[in-house]
Regions:
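Catalytic pocket of metal/acid-base enzymes, prominently hydrolases
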Residues: 1-78, 102-154
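Active-site-proximal loop/turn and secondary-structure-junction residues that shape catalytic pockets
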Residues: 50-53, 80-84, 166-168, 197-198
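Histidine/acidic-residue-rich catalytic or RNA/ligand-binding cores of hydrolases
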Residues: 57-60, 170-178
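Short, hinge-like loop/turn segments at secondary-structure boundaries
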Residues: 63-64, 94-95, 178-181
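Phosphate/diphosphate-binding loops
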Residues: 68-111, 190-197
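Conserved hydrophobic/aromatic pocket- or pore-lining residues that grip, position, or stack substrates
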Residues: 117, 163, 193
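Conserved helix-loop functional segments at active or binding sites
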Residues: 152, 175-183
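Short acidic/histidine-rich active-site segments
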Residues: 158-168
């Protein structure tokens, strides 16, 4: 027995993927998603981090197969994330992915990056005094890695979304934004913070 969290999902997926992504189970789940969206009158749904489980191409193919048809009355907006993509290939794959919109399954120049960990698992990064038991939380992307990735996409005109929870994670993320605005101002950048747990 053991525990995995955050990026540990990569190791766990090796054993879980055949069950979780079994084709009939996946098709059933996507059909249920369509039913729920229809019942709720939802016109647009989104996936803020596609590509991390099966890869951008496979996930896009699955979603198009499920929703690019007349039985679907909503749009699906997909934002790619480099965290599960092959190192060194992520930017090329994401840039290609951004051009692959269809009428119902939309892509675009958006990317989701990950600063610190989740709040439920107490993996968000906290400033002093931090956690009462002394643990530190986790970086999903080290601050310099976050800066480098954000700069690359920002300079290419992407809207940058960042998963951030703790106040230390927030400080790092806001410093990234301040640096980007100083280096290459963009008045309508729409830099977006996701979750903001603390």
């Amino acid at each position: 027995t053991g525990v995995f969290s955050e990026r540990g999902i990569k190791a766990a997926l090796a054993g879980l993927a055949p069950y979780i992504f079994e084709p009939e189970r996946l098709a059933y789940g996507l059909e249920r998603l369509r039913e729920i969206a229809h019942r709720g009158g939802i016109t647009t749904i989104g996936d803020m981090g596609i590509g991390g489980y099966l890869g951008l191409d496979r996930e896009l193919e699955l979603l198009r197969g499920a929703f690019e048809n007349d039985a679907t009355s909503f749009r699906l907006f997909l934002v790619s994330s480099p965290w599960g993509l092959p190192a060194g290939m992520d930017q090329k794959l994401i840039r290609d992915f951004a051009t692959r919109s269809t009428s119902r399954v939309r892509t675009g120049k958006h990317v989701k990056l990950l600063a610190d960990g989740g709040f439920f698992a107490q993996n968000m990064r906290m400033n002093f005094p931090g956690y009462t038991d002394g643990h530190q939380g986790k970086w999903m992307m080290e601050p310099d890695e976050l800066m480098s990735a954000a700069r690359s996409y920002w300079n290419d005109g992407y809207q940058v979304h960042v998963h951030v929870n703790g106040d230390e994670g927030m400080d790092v993320t806001l410093n990234v934004l301040a640096t980007l605005l100083e280096e290459q101002p963009r008045p309508d950048h729409r830099f977006t913070l996701h979750h903001v747990g603390y």
